Amino acid sequence: MKEATDDYDLSKLVSNFYRLEKITKINYAQYLPKKQNDQWGIQMEIQMRKKDRKLLVALLSKELWCFSINDQVLPSPNDIDPELNVSADKTGSFTADYSKPNLPPHYALFLKSLKRMIYLNLVEQSKNTLVQFGNSCINITKNNESNNLLQIEPHLFSNSELAISICVKDLGLLPLKVNSIDPAFLSSHALYMAPSGVRVYLVENKNDNSGTNQEHLHKYLVPVPENGEVLLKTLYASHGIKLNSSTCQWVNIIPNITHLNGRAPNISQYMDLPKELRTIVWPLDLVFAQPALDIDSSTTLSQINGLDTFEDTLSLIDNFLQLKQSSSYRTPGSSGGLTGTNIGTNVFSSEGAYTDQFQVYPKSQTNQQQTSSNSKVSPSDAASPYPGIDKIIEQKQFTPDFMASPSVSGNSNELFNDRKNGHTDLLISPSKMDVDTDFPGSNLAGQEAPSQPASDVKKSSVSASDSELFGEEDEDEDDADLFGESNNDSTGESNANNSKGEITEDIFASSDDESSLQPKKESTFYDGIKNGSAESGLNMQDRANLKRTYLDIRIEETPLSSPLYTDPGAPLPVETPRDRRKSVFAPLNFNPIIAKDVDNKYKNGGKYSFSPLQKEEALNFDVSRTELSSSEGEDSESSDDELEDLANKNDGVVYDKAENIGYKTFANLQDSVPPGLIKQDFLGNPYLASLEGSKEGQNTIWKMPQTDIAQTESPLKAIDTSIGPDGTLPNTTSSEQSKSVYVHDYGISPTKMSNDPAFDTAKIEGKYEFMNNFPSSFPFLLRHMPLSLIPDTFKHLNPTITVNERNNQIIDLLAEQIVYDYNILGNLTIPDVPYSGIRNYSNGVVKNTIDNLFSEFTRLDGTTLISRLYPMETPFVSVRKQHDQIKLRSDVQQFTKYANLKPVRGIKNFKFLVLTDSFKEDCIQFISSLSQTYINHELGFCEHLQLTNEDSKGLIYLKDFEDSKLLLLAAQIVSYLSTNRTSGKEVAFMMIIPVQRCDISELVEKTAKFQIIQNEVKAKIPSMELYLKIVPMDFIKSPLTSVDDYTNLCISIYNILPNKMIKFTHIRKQIPEKLTFKTSQQASAFKYDAYIHLAYSRSVDKQWMFAALSDSAGKENMMKTWYLGSSKNKFDEACNHIWEMALSLAGKNYGKVCLILTRLNGILPDDELMNWRRLSGRNIHLAVVCVDDNTKISFFDRNESYPSYKRLYQNANSIETLVDPERIDDYLIRDLDQDIHGVIFENPFPLVNSLHRCAIKSGALVKFNVSTTATEPHSLDKFEVNLLNCPHSDSFKLLETILEEFRNLAALNVWFGITNGENGHIPWHVLAVKKMMKTLVHTRVKVAQ
């Protein structure tokens, strides 16, 4: 259906897609090892790539897949060694007519092999200027600027054109240099290893090199490992990275196993060490650093450690003395049965109630004290980068025992948390005292901590170095060799100078490690393994990390006596057994350990379970019978209370991230894919694929796959006998056994290799130099993490809030302040990090390499990619003028103040107080201006509260926000409200609190202060609700704050007052131009009576979930935030809550309702889909879309005349000729941010972060840039919409309707106070979720019991 817009020349709209080949067929062959050898496929892939860089080969578990395009000859392992004489287990071919939305396995494997081949040749041709980094390539420059990431994504369009998209992204990555390594640098930079992109942590070399030829080594450098040569050869053969073995420097690093297994580390604790502390040796040239968002180069090491004042030093000494004194009241053999908070009690009295932690509060610069409220906050301290790590890791290297399985440590991530300021709750273990100290730099109430400007941290535009990569004019001499010019410097090795600085014991004197208070011989986990036995280390682990008995109270740390437990002969208290998590669909519990020994009937949930093939009327979401990619398996990796068996632990392999295989939704995938062999660049693992070639309508999303993947035994079966019931190794495990466990866990078995007669190592030695002596770091060559698993930004100083199970209202308060802020908080200084396309290219390493690999390299334009481009009508909204309800165009919001418009659904009255500790006079003026503006615009009436005669009206001025003063203020508020209560409807009471800085730390702190007051008031007056509004102090004190700004602030206040669902306006429903009678079944097939919208997203670390709901007009609107943490059932509870909200919204509509389920970030995991399956019923039809405004697809506008307003910007004098004064009344005033066009693409696109799925229809809402020219084209602002299913047959019509609905909801952004006029192409509910997710992920949350 080609319907191009007549007014726009689509040939002038160019994309970042490049056509490579015209495909008639793709040939494939599958090879399996004869003897089930674990290494055969790995070796064949490496050897085949080494021999011919253009071969298309891919590895899946033990299977080797080979591909060829059109009539090219299929590659075969026999080409490497004819003596192998292997035959293909399966052969075939496929075309571009593949099934959607789930891609068949062979198609995804083909894309994976294609991308690997392109990256391999790019890296090799660039001579290490490009290095693969995750599923991208990092462009290494020779200056100190950040290095952009080059990302290439292949796609086979339905018109048989094989194309790739090329884009760049700047994460601020810098190569790690020896002379830049110091504790201050490590505490503010996250490290990653290439080519995998896995998060790592640097370890100081503790080996004694004195008297050896290694004396010159830097303290972080280690000698060349014995398998270093093998690793370098493997790097070159598999990735094209060529390092000089004579000049290569090596470092000891701790890889984050959770990240390796496909789950991003906790963003709010991103600088904390992982629980698994095993090390590997890696080339320094392949380690990169990403700066924290709040990095301050002027911060000294003493400031980072919080020891720059004499008072803080004395406080630490005093705490230590108090610890010694309190130890006299602890004796082994005693027990207690109470844990809780002991406030206001002498902690040294043996007669009072005791806690599991003695809480001591030293003096604080800000005089902040601990609060007894359920929700509190504390900015964390920034301790040394890895506190106590020199005591934890004292061995030279731990390569033999490096395991792929997740850590069995039962301790939480708090083991190495950074903490700061006076509210810190140390919940590490009962052996640790709470030492709350205020550290300079985090005084959120007073002094301002300097931070690097956002513009310096992230760059949205493509740097010159990336432009040169594509051969543009301004070429750098250092990179000239990339673009065909001669350059003698072809290696690019690092010759960094050795640093003289050292990290001493004094720097890490205050360790947050549990073992710091334990005997010296137990302080090192690896001591026993270092001496040939793991007994000592595992005993230490059993004691410190595994789940403890007796209410988690250590015997030697219980008090001498307790009034709460006085019977010395009674048995010790026993924990209440935890309920096993039950499936949403199956009433029977299922233990995966015994899966192979049970009936299929019970394995699938019994006779009452849902059948995977069950069909429903409205939406047929057929689901695989095998285990889904769920948060349960992923959360088990970081669970602190329950240790799962090793098989369950391995379920944490990536399920829903881009380009990771672990979807496990085809039969027995969890048994056939070793986690160590599951590489990121499997292109998102299509392996939840639908039936090949199946086209049973457009609602066959997530069909039961008929996989082509052979069923192989789980690699875990070979080591079942060596795994304990708790997932730990027995004490008798030797280092050789540990090595065997390790290699099996990654599917690498030297033992099997040597015992296999078909692969005699003696016979083939010399042919395959990679088959023996696998380095322990080999698994990190097999995985490539997607960029979606690396946060765009992170902070090394994160605020902390504490909530309990019954009251987490502070989270909703924070979300409300973030969303409805009219952008006066400036996104809390957290920048966007967009993907950027390449405007132009000429002869360079990319073009030359692609030209050498494929038959063409032609840029695609709109004539090929776009089916329809059309302007969208601006919707109308309802408002009141005097006493009449009128309709206006939605883009006239900024003229509301001049037209004396009123809210459509009535006024909202409130009374308020401004609570401040500075700028008293400015606040008084602010109160006057705010109240006058609110009343003048007829939003309602507002009353200034005066609690005492000494106070100014509407103002409470405190020198500081001590908890005692806040409680006194709460008592005054209670007294005032009790005295002045009326018999009528209560007027809402709001507190306005200014913030000195617009950052997440101060926002969290001020919200927690309000929570103290709110809890106290509600305790006395349960029916009283308090409301909060955070306003920047710059807004209050600035003389440039305009009346328009006050108007916007008043409207945002109106929108959050009760009833919160009532906003200033809503979309006015248009009278249809024609009536459609439902006289036939076909006419009513795709006609819905109402649409409701649900937008949601989960954070990349799976810690948070956000949702917003709306009807088509915005009359009904809700939003909610959930902190999931590491809980196994919180995700299901959140989904249930969302389900209830959606059903309640649908229940207010009549007739046939379509629920448009919108998932952000271009991804849809299986565990989420299983929950949403319930949302489809007889009267509710589910349309699933994935959306994102930051995609890897870009369009550049070269048209200078469309839209017509471009000419006004190109020539300011042209307005005199273009505008006719005599027809001035015929012109309309337009807001260009609201000038939106709809786009429906000719071919569907794959999801940006789930390349295993492809839309059945793709479209977008776009905005044109007013300053674009033919020579300087600008990219379109684009909100991409991918439709994944269609409840009826006309997907084109449904997508058009969804785009229209989204465009209407986007018009409410500025009216709801979500934005100040920007992002007019993003629907309000999507933008609300995006704002919450962008900011709240940087907040630590502790759940109080």
UniProtKB/Swiss-Prot annotation:
Annotated stretches, region: Disordered: 363-387, 402-537
- Give a Gene Ontology cellular component term annotated to this protein: mediator complex
Subcellular location per UniProt equals: Nucleus
- The residue range of the signal peptide is none
Question: Which is a GO BP term held by this UniProt record?
Answer: positive regulation of transcription by RNA polymerase II
Compositional bias segments (type: Acidic residues): 469-482
Point to the regions of Polar residues compositional bias.
406-415, 486-501
User: What is the similarity comment for this entry?
Assistant: Belongs to the Mediator complex subunit 13 family.
Q: Where is the composition biased (Low complexity)?
A: 364-375
Gene for this protein? Answer: SSN2
* Coiled-coil spans in chain: none
What protein name does the entry list?
Mediator of RNA polymerase II transcription subunit 13
InterPro entries according to UniProt: Med13_C, Mediator_complx_sub13, Mediator_Med13_N
Q: Superkingdom, according to UniProt?
A: Eukaryota
Alphabetical keyword list: Activator, Nucleus, Repressor, Transcription, Transcription regulation
Gene Ontology MF terms in the entry: cyclin binding; transcription coactivator activity
Q: What does this protein do?
A: Component of the SRB8-11 complex. The SRB8-11 complex is a regulatory module of the Mediator complex which is itself involved in regulation of basal and activated RNA polymerase II-dependent transcription. The SRB8-11 complex may be involved in the transcriptional repression of a subset of genes regulated by Mediator. It may inhibit the association of the Mediator complex with RNA polymerase II to form the holoenzyme complex.
How does this protein assemble?
Component of the SRB8-11 complex, which itself associates with the Mediator complex.
* A UniProt-annotated Pfam family: Med13_N
